[in-house]
Amino acid sequence: MMSIQRATQINRQFDYMSIKELWMAKFPLHKPGDCLDMFKNGNYTGLTMECIQRTKASKKNTIFHIKSDFNSTDYDEPPISGFKMFTQHCCQRIDEHFCGALHPVISNIEFEQNQLRTRPQVASEFNLFIPCGIKNLKIESGEDPTWIVGTKFRKCMCLKPVMVAATIIGTPVNKNLITFCSSDYIQVIVNRNREGSCGICMGNTSTYEACGNWTNETWGEEFSLDLKLCYKCTPVAFIFSLMMSTGHKPYVSKRQFEENRRKWERVLNYKICEENLDSHLACANHENVYKSIKKYEFFDSIWVYHLANSSWVRDLTRECIESNPGPNYIQLLNEHSQRYGFIQPTYEIIAVVSDGHHSYQCTCYYKDTKTQSIGPSKKNAKHQAAEQMFRHQCF
């Protein structure tokens, strides 16, 4: 199964990974995707799994199946009907990039096993969704309050600062911190325990209703997939396609999305948050989680944004920890060739003159295809050529 093969690297290291690493594995590193747990009681060799592999979402390499220590019945059980779920992919990148996926927040808290008993898209009591524009959060789940203080931020696709890393002060919250764009997010209402048996975990199937994030919303009308699946085993791309096929459309159209991308690339300044984020917190989070949020502060100064980021980088330098350089495409190409039995890529580097400067041209050969790139150094040219080849052959 292709979705299992894509997660081979994670599944091989599963027994040696910490709980925090297992949670981060649910957020693909190189591009947005959807990581689904492989339950111990699940059937991942049957016809239902084969149908998933034949879909467009699977062929686009956005569906991953990773190992799990749980049975499907061990998952956190939300209400029988009426709980919400995002229909967006997940992404682990923390650098500046235009992305509408859900992102994890790196923090100093220790993870517990129970925090893995949910999907990142589900409004569970184990997940705390933080919209862009928020700087700090105060939570009171017990006697002592807890402050979530953002220490690093990036530019969201709506130009507001969004939290990337945070420090937990006070009582540990033991919740998964996840961020989303408050200007463009899509949710559905999930009704579990409907008639029918899931083709993977044998649980009851689920139906879905449209929320206010959709146009032509039909309150109370339930829609179900032709493929019998529960919400735990259903890729979010299937739910999105289901809603689109029933006449629903997101408020942010594809054309508007591309216009926002061009604006994001053109505008260097950040947008100050001037809207009330209380409604977004209420819509995204579980009812009990929302009630525990007593106070939040949003960015009202770009100077504070730059100061927080510069302080975060300065601390990393003092601790001799380099920032995330991004994916190593040379290594990824080698892994791709070993995984599928192809001859490893070869590189040819020559010295050239480009724009009056001494440069290097690297040619990458892989699978009867070649890519060329020019860079100021041999290393830079080789990485750029490998990146072009990886995006051409592996995506």
Swiss-Prot record:
Keywords: RNA-binding
One Gene Ontology molecular-function label: RNA binding
InterPro entries for this protein: dsRBD_dom
Domain DRBM: residue ranges: 328-395
Pfam families given in the database record: dsrm
Database matches in CDD domains: DSRM_SF (cd00048)
Gene3D superfamilies linked: 3.30.160.20
Short sequence motif Putative autoproteolytic cleavage motif: positions: 320-327
The protein's name in its UniProt record: Non-structural protein 1
